[in-house]
Amino acid sequence: MGMSVSHLLIVLLIIFVLFGAGKLPQVMSDLAKGLKAFKDGMKDDGSDNDKNK
């Protein structure tokens, strides 16, 4: 039950309406930084588990 293209477009439209065109680049930048930090955290957690074994 993944997101189809139409669902993705609706979500993007809602985000655009809520934040407006001026603030949207900042919101996307913050989201990208958050995702990168999450991925880096997941990598760190995986390597810690290997050391404990």
Curated annotation (Swiss-Prot):
Protein's job: Part of the twin-arginine translocation (Tat) system that transports large folded proteins containing a characteristic twin-arginine motif in their signal peptide across membranes. TatA could form the protein-conducting channel of the Tat system.
Membrane topology according to the record: Single-pass membrane protein
InterPro entries cross-referenced by the UniProt entry: TatA/B/E (IPR003369), TatA/E (IPR006312)
This protein's name: Sec-independent protein translocase protein TatA
Keyword Signal included in the entry's annotation: no
Classification via NCBIfam families: PRK01470.1, tatAE
One GO cellular component term: TAT protein transport complex
Similarity comment: Belongs to the TatA/E family.
Subcellular localization, as worded in the UniProt entry: Cell inner membrane
Gene3D superfamilies per the UniProt record, alphabetical: 1.20.5.3310
Pfam families: TatA_B_E
Organism: Rickettsia massiliae (strain Mtu5)
Main location: membrane
